[in-house]
From Swiss-Prot:
Lineage: superkingdom: Bacteria
PANTHER family membership: UPF0398 PROTEIN SPR0331, UPF0398 PROTEIN YPSA
Family affiliation: Belongs to the UPF0398 family.
NCBIfam families: PRK13660.1
Name this protein carries in UniProt: UPF0398 protein SAB1311c
InterPro entries listed in its UniProt record: YspA
Length: 187
């Protein structure tokens, strides 16, 4: 049974998404919603993120929406270090602040500012040790920052009974095609 899932993946710029109204976001959020609803049917209680722009913050937007129906669903934002949004533009900082207002739990692994890449590695390790499953949206065909976490995830799974759902672009494309077809049929 999966009670806690860590959701991560590409940052928005790694997907060439630079605007909040990009149509790709709608489909990605529908996909994330579909995955979380499947886990809710199996007893999901918590969704964890580290507060990155892209897949992680879109996930929290989905969770906030789902909480209207699933009032027992909670989400936590656990950042690698404090002040990780300080270099973000004002618009993104505002979006993040809104997410934090809705979060059920907020903390940082390191209660200091950025000191080095080891903080990201420790945060990734923390997420693995405090979740039952990872939903990773990452395709090796388009390498980006999640590749480092994926390697850690694979190593962790080799040593434990941890499970993951690594979503590739093929799976995303199939879901989007089905969704577009069903949306076309509803008109």
């Amino acid at each position: 049974m999966v009670k806690t899932v860590y959701v991560t993946g590409y940052k928005s710029f790694e997907l060439n998404i630079f605007k909040d109204d990009a149509p790709e976001i709608h489909y990605l959020k529908q996909f994330i919603k579909h995955k979380i609803e499947q886990l809710l049917d199996e007893g999901l209680e918590w969704v964890l993120i580290q507060g990155q722009m892209g897949i992680e913050l879109w996930t929290t937007e989905v969770v906030i929406e789902l909480q209207r129906t699933y009032d027992s669903l909670k989400f936590a934002v656990i950042t690698p270090f404090q002040g990780h949004t300080e270099k973000w533009n004002e618009h993104n900082q505002s979006k993040y602040a809104n997410i934090i207002k809705h979060a059920d739990y907020v903390d940082s692994i390191f209660h200091t500012s950025y000191q080095g890449p080891f903080q990201f590695k420790q945060a990734d390790q923390f997420m693995l040790e405090h979740s039952d499953q990872t939903l990773l949206i990452y395709d090796e065909e388009q390498e980006a920052s999640p590749k480092f976490f994926k390697q850690m995830l694979v190593d962790f799974m080799d040593k434990t009974n941890y499970t993951c759902d690594i979503v590739t672009f093929d799976e995303l494309t199939a879901f989007i095609n089905d969704l577009q077809w069903s949306e076309d049929q509803s008109f």
